[in-house]
Amino acid sequence: QSTFHDDNYTNNVRLGAMSNWALILNPKNKIEFRNIFNQLATKETVIRKGELFENGLELSNQSFRYEQKSILSSQLSGTHELSEKTNLKWISGLGYTQRSEPDFRRFTSSRPMGSGEAYRIDLQQFESPTLQQAARFWSNMDEYVLTGTVNMEQILGKKNIVDEMNKVLKVGVYTEYKDRYFKARWFGIVNPNRVDASITSQKPEDFFSNDNL
């Protein structure tokens, strides 16, 4: 039997910006430039306290996580009335998405139930790390998208003042190029040499320092 209580602390910060521009060259030609940018940052800390009665242990598990997401979308387009019966519209676009999780840390720690001792971080005693005990995770993803579209409309025959009565031939082309780069690594800290409590009883910020690796 076991009991647990979780405290979850989350902080979100969001930033957004939008910019739209239009250049009207004349009544028959217009150029537009649209941009939108969003960024979201999330910081999360989870502290779990509990008792593992069958093993006679008090547990204190913690995780620290930061994630950042960015999205940029830009579009340059043009609308042109080439003649009374011919219209041309083109759109070029750029999209960028970025997601970063620079250092996700988590660990479990325990002490004998009712002892009042300092918690000791639990480590695997052999060379087989896990993602649950004293682990760190890094990931980064960048994605680029380029798009291009050209559409043309040609009214066939005599133009009717009622648009719905016109016979219209529509042709278009669309192209897209996408490139994605993703990298992820994780490390699990093990204790095959049985280091003493002076290391495993450290505070998380000290335990995860480079001096202990």
Which residue ranges define each predicted feature?
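Transmembrane beta-strands of outer-membrane beta-barrel pores
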Residues: F37-A41, L94-S100, N140, Y144-L146, ...
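Short loop/turn motifs that connect adjacent beta-strands in outer-membrane beta-barrel proteins
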Residues: P27-K28, S83-N87, G157-V168, A184
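Residue-level signature of outer-membrane beta-barrel architecture
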Residues: S19-L25, H80-L82, Q154-L156
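Hydrophobic, lipid-facing positions within transmembrane beta-strands of outer-membrane proteins
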Residues: V13-S19, S70-L76, S92, Y144-M152
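Outer-membrane beta-barrel translocator domains and adjoining extracellular loop/strand segments
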Residues: Q1, E44-E51, E101-S109, F182-G188
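Flexible glycine-rich, low-complexity coil/linker segments exposed to the extracellular/periplasmic environment
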Residues: S115-A134, K183-L213
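Transmembrane beta-barrel wall of Gram-negative outer-membrane proteins
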Residues: Q1-T45, L72
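Flexible, solvent-exposed coil segments and beta strand-coil junctions
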Residues: Q1-T3, K49-S60, D122-A134
